[in-house]
Every structure is written in C-alpha cells, then in structure tokens.
C-alpha cells in the first residue's frame, strides 16, 4: 500500500522490454490513507516485473520496532497494473492481518481493490486517483460488500536544490472502511530529495507531514529507499 520512491541508480528500457525492479523502503512510521497501521519503524520491500505497459508488483511491510504487541504488524500485497501514456489501471489484493496469521482466508482477511490513476503530465503535474474495494473483507455490519472508496489528488512541485514538494489530499465519498460517512481522510505535505553518495549512486530521502481529520491525528514521517 505504500507509495513508490524513485530509486538510484536507474536504467531506462524500451516499453516492450522485460524489466525487473526491487527496492526496500525504510520508514519511521507507516500511515496509510490517514490511518496509523501500528507498525512504527518498518521495512517495506517490493519486487516489480514489467513488460509492454503491464506490471506485477509484490509489496510488503514488516515492523522492526513494535514486537511487544499482541499481533505485530505485517502486510503482503499483490498489484496488477497496466499503464499507457498518463493513465493506469491497477487491481490490488491487500492482506494486513499481521505476523503468524493465516494468509489463505480470502473472504475474511483480504481486501480487493481497483484503482484508476491519471497524471496530467510534466507541464501540469497533477495526479488524480480513484480506488474502490470490490471483493473480500470489505463488508458492513450486515456482511454485504460496501465498496469503500478513496479519492486522492496530489501535485508535484519542483524546487531549487533538486527538492520536490508534493501536497496531497485524500477523501472518502461515502460510508465504508475508512469512516462512517463522507470525509477527508488525509492531508499531507511531502518533501523529497536525492542525497548524492557517489557520482553513480544516490539515496532518496523524504519527510512528510500528515493530518488525518477523520481520526483527529497528526504525523511526521521520514524515510529513505534503496533499490535497483
């Protein structure tokens, strides 16, 4: 469920070439769509295979600090995507039941979601996404699927010293997994910069301030990434 961070060194391939990318994000805390995942300092590895606009991504999160709780935080997600120009569509299988919990209970512990994303381009770097859960454990008190939906808008701003500033806002339009009515889930401001280590290697570093109106919570998160 995490947001991808650009990795260095990087290679550019033609769209019809098979690509393999791996990375590990290290984050001071794990906040997803305004919700604290009770993870604390965590490692979030991912593996992505891509070909001709299609990709399959496996993403995970594992707490490195909060082991003294009943169920330590652990997540394993699978994402299937297709991208063309500025548009992408993704189908995700989320599982976040925790350490030593069974994975195969698809009706009770997996959340299946579809996401549409559109980026307007470099001249107007606004990105809009709409994500709706359509199967699995996303059910109301009556056991019926509730179609929990999350809408996000972000705008990337390039600043001097190669710093990128990204304000973003998230909203849920109706009652569901996120809240009992329509509400703003998260408002954030993220600053990122690639820290040069050598001429051929840099480490992306970010700091993000997050306000979660529906939970009346605030967070200040930092992290860095390594990958190929």
Residue ranges and their predicted role:
Residues 1-19:
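Cleavable N-terminal export/targeting peptides
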Residues 16-20, 39-43, 50, 72-76, ...:
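Residues that define the transmembrane beta-barrel architecture of outer-membrane proteins
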Residues 24-30, 54-65, 89-101, 124-136, ...:
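Transmembrane beta-strand segments that form the barrel wall of outer-membrane beta-barrel proteins
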Residues 157, 189-191, 195, 216-228:
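Outer-membrane beta-barrel "beta-signal"
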Residues 13-19, 86, 121-125, 158-166, ...:
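Short loop/turn motifs that connect adjacent beta-strands in outer-membrane beta-barrel proteins
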Residues 164-197, 206:
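Outer membrane beta-barrel transmembrane domains
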Residues 15-65:
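Short glycine/proline- and aromatic-enriched beta-strand/turn motifs that initiate or cap beta-hairpins
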Residues 105-175:
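Detector for outer-membrane/organellar transmembrane beta-barrel domains
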């Amino acid at each position: 469920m995490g947001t991808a961070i650009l990795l260095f060194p990087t290679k550019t391939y033609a769209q019809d070439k098979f690509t393999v990318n791996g990375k590990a994000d290290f984050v001071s805390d794990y906040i997803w769509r305004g919700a604290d995942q009770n993870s604390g300092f965590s490692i979030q590895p991912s593996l992505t295979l891509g070909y001709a606009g299609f990709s399959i991504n496996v993403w995970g999160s594992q707490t490195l600090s909060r082991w003294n709780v009943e169920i330590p935080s652990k997540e394993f997600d699978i994402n299937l995507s297709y991208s063309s120009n500025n548009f992408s569509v993704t189908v995700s299988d989320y599982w976040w039941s925790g350490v030593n919990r069974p994975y195969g209970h698809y009706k009770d512990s997996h959340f299946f979601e579809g996401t549409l994303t559109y980026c307007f381009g470099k001249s107007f770097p606004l990105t809009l996404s709409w994500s709706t859960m359509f199967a699995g454990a996303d059910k109301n008190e009556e056991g019926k699927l509730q179609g929990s939906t999350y809408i996000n808008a972000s705008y990337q701003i390039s600043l001097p010293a190669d710093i990128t500033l990204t304000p973003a806002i998230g909203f849920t339009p109706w009652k569901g997994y996120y809240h009992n009515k329509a509400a703003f889930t998260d408002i954030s401001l993220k600053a990122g910069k690639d820290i040069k280590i050598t001429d051929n290697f840099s480490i992306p570093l970010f700091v993000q301030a997050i306000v979660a109106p529906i939970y009346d919570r605030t967070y200040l998160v930092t992290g860095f990434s390594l990958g190929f």
